[in-house]
């Protein structure tokens, strides 16, 4: 009975190990594994590779060429007033997004305000006509001053943290000073889109924000709306989605929301992918835009040919900073080295237009995966006995198969299965179970060796340990083969030997016979004078029959 109490029931061991996967579930739910999970999502993007989108996105770069040709920031808005009409009217693009907040904050008073105001008026005049141009608004500046000099504190208003009693401050919006004398005489365009992302990253962005002034949609949402030809009042916000609805009531597309507000961006390609991301310098576009009005017919013809390129036709154009000196860079799932963040808007537009949204399982399903995979892998990994190596290999193959399935589901269905929590829970629980199993096996081996080490061979002891069964102290019925041996005429010649030589002879004889019996899988029962009693088939059955064996009797004579 003592042996049975020494080994705790199997269910008790697993019950004590159950908190391990639960802790991993809590860590996953609290977002403490997000960094590692995001890294594994990046690997899945790279495993999947580049995919195509049903919308053309062209990037007009504010790059080193543009900065060296036009000059350093801030530019006169005249340059934008010339480029935008050329892209929309001449090139036939569907919409343009300008990834720069047209703000008068931080502009030096020493600049030529006459020229700046002239440029502001020219761009304001064009934008007031309502072209499909989305200008940028942002919460990037947390502290600002309004026209009265009052400090304004801004932070991105998230719906999950919103308090109904505290209306959020609006973002910093475009403002054009249109008076040389009065700095407070400002004009702002009506079509404005947010350019913010969560934590300045490239994975998630707010589809909209409610403020005390109005609701602002993300620039990518506005560009997608223009692409589909939906009116501003056709954008309907619900708890878990946004609908684009035409005037006749038909649904154009539905944008699923994460946390009632967020869009998770599906990246379609690396930044340096000419086929997916055609790019051209702002300086080049500006030069050709100016050539459209040249007196030289050859220049006008060259400009018309430039804007007639098929890449422009019905494309979405994004104008944004790409020069590293402008410090608008971030890493992406495809690019470990930071690249221009204007690519966020391009991939977000592609996500909305294509409908290829990243999908995640419900929380309950994620937790079920963690617990289920942990139980399966741990049971296999902790299995002992003769099949222990095979079951451990099966556990490793099961984990490998899960990782492969996670990559395939992402590749084929854009579904994100959790990896960090399931793998972490399976590894840690399996490790703890294996260590526990080893400790129990060592204790079991010690008990069996203590009981049978003098009677059975080491190989048989190992077999008893591997069998996982405790010795049955109460006895049991089984078929065994008994073995008896003694020395012929022992009484006669023992009288002729002295006690010393007799003891030496008996030790040598009994040791040799015992070794031979144990080598054949037998178990020593006892010594009776010069006789030895042994048995075959207990405490464990023989793996082979005794038929045809060479009996130890021939070796003990």
What are these regions (language model features)?
Residues 2-258, 309-391:
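Non-transmembrane functional regions of envelope-associated proteins
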Residues 224, 319, 349, 457, ...:
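Conserved hydrophobic/aromatic pocket- or pore-lining residues that grip, position, or stack substrates
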Residues 237, 241-297, 301:
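Substrate-access "cap/lid" subdomains that shape
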Residues 419-478, 504:
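Regulatory cytosolic signal-relay segments
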Residues 471-552:
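Catalytic NTP-binding/metal-coordinating core of nucleotidyl cyclase/transferase enzymes
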